[in-house]
Amino acid sequence: MEIEKNKEKIKLQFDIIKRTDGYISTTNNKAALLLAVNGATATILSNKVGYFAGLFHENCLYMVIFFLLLFMISIFIFMSVLLSLKSIIPNMRGVKEKWDSTDSNVSFVYISSNNDGKNYYKKYLMESEDGLLLDMCEQSFILSCIAKQKFLFFSSAVSWIKRAYACIIVLVIFKFVDYVNGALL
């Protein structure tokens, strides 16, 4: 009866590992898409910056605000790119501090450290069901820590690009106000 319980628990842990790995993959894809959005935003803005430079008859205060907004947009896009890259690039430093085991039958890092497939097979056969369950629980924990870290970086990257778009909206409003002032005069 105990063996059946372990098999169900192992199956559940396998499902948890697959789900968490799916979250990690999805976050990587979203971060890559956000990098593309950042690149497109920076390209479009750099090509259209001239349309905003001479507004309000080159008023000194407007020019200061204009350059301040451009600086802020650049910083916000840079921070979004940086955090998107941090979200994509694997970082196991924080996880290794929480987990010291160097002998896993589930982790690709430790599977690849075997001499060959036969060596891994022998090692795998020697593992008890309790040991396999413990190994899978440790892998679930590690993947969950990685997924959480990726989510935090991605969420932060999104908040930075939102700030950049808020500044861009302010520039567009300035352009609209200048257009209305010119049309009414």
Swiss-Prot record:
Keywords noted in UniProt: Antiviral defense, Cell inner membrane, Cell membrane, Membrane, Nucleotide-binding, Transmembrane, Transmembrane helix
Transmembrane portions of the chain: 32-52, 63-83, 141-161
Subcellular location(s) of the protein: Cell inner membrane
An example Gene Ontology CC term for this record: plasma membrane
GO molecular function, one term: nucleotide binding
One annotated GO biological process: defense response to virus
Main location: membrane
Membrane topology listed for this record: Multi-pass membrane protein
Function in brief: Pycsar (pyrimidine cyclase system for antiphage resistance) provides immunity against bacteriophage. The pyrimidine cyclase (PycC) synthesizes cyclic nucleotides in response to infection; these serve as specific second messenger signals. The signals activate the adjacent effector, leading to bacterial cell death and abortive phage infection. A clade E Pycsar system. The effector component of a two-gene Pycsar system. Expression of this and adjacent cytidylate cyclase EcPycC (AC P0DV24) confers resistance to bacteriophage P1 and T5; this protein is required for resistance. When cells expressing the Pycsar system are infected by phage T5 at low multiplicity of infection (0.2 MOI) the culture survives, at 2.0 MOI bacteria enter growth arrest. The same cells enter growth arrest after exposure to 250 uM cCMP but not cUMP; this effector protein responds only to cCMP, usually produced by its cognate NTP cyclase.
Misc: T5 phage that escape Pycsar have mutated major capsid protein pb8 (D20, AC Q6QGD8); infection with these phage elicits less cCMP production. Ectopic expression of the capsid protein in addition to both Pycsar genes does not induce effector-mediated toxicity, suggesting another factor is necessary.
This protein's name: Pycsar effector protein EcPycTM
Organism, as annotated: Escherichia coli
Classification of source organism: Bacteria, Pseudomonadati, Pseudomonadota, Gammaproteobacteria, Enterobacterales
